[in-house]
């Protein structure tokens, strides 16, 4: 199925939710991302219709932990209204008084299901995992669940 037209535009994604949902010491999370509407590789066909789109973001949790990151995402149209978006990012984590993730370099994998709510705006539900992929002495990882508003600009 073709990707809806909003997917080929630059967008902002604003998310709120819960940081560290699998732990009793969870906290709130807020996130802002800039989503590029352009394929990272332009018109080149590297692996079929890969269309990997870059994004950058900033996350802050209720314990003053901060995560600055950049990555790639791929949109899959499920229907004319629904989109499934897996993504991967790498970034810098400053824990402050938040959970110790074992290293400042952290990687995030995420899945998002979003629905077109009109005027090329979408609302989405996200689940992600952040960990250092064992480059640190410890690798506790953390999961987050958020709701997003995605709006083109």
Roles of regions detected by a PLM:
Residues 1-9:
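Cleavable N-terminal export/targeting peptides
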Residues 12-16, 54-56, 84-88, 109, ...:
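Membrane-embedded beta-strand positions of outer-membrane beta-barrel proteins
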Residues 19-28, 58-69, 78-80, 97-104, ...:
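Solvent-exposed loop/turn segments connecting transmembrane beta-strands
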Residues 34-39, 74-76, 115, 129, ...:
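Residue-level signature of outer-membrane beta-barrel architecture
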Residues 10-12, 38-47, 80-84, 119-125:
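Repeated loop/turn-to-beta-strand initiation elements of outer-membrane beta-barrel proteins
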Residues 28-61:
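N-terminal, post-signal-peptide region of Sec/Tat-exported proteins
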Residues 82-110:
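Mid-chain, well-packed structural core segment of small domains
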Residues 28-34, 141-153:
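Outer-membrane beta-barrel "beta-signal"
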């Amino acid at each position: 199925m073709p990707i809806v037209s909003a997917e080929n535009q630059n967008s902002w994604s604003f998310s709120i939710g819960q940081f560290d949902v699998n732990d009793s010491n969870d906290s709130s999370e807020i996130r802002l991302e800039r989503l590029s509407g352009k394929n990272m590789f332009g018109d080149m066909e590297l692996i079929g219709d890969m269309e990997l789109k870059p994004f950058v973001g900033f996350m802050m949790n209720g314990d003053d932990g901060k995560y600055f990151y950049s990555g790639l995402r791929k949109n899959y149209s499920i229907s004319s209204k629904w989109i499934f978006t897996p993504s991967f990012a790498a970034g810098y984590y400053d824990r402050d008084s938040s959970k110790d993730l074992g290293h400042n370099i952290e990687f995030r994998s995420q899945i998002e299901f979003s629905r077109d709510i009109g005027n090329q705006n979408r609302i989405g539900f996200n689940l992600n995992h952040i960990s250092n992929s064992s480059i640190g002495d410890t690798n506790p990882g953390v999961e987050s669940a958020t709701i997003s508003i995605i709006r083109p600009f």
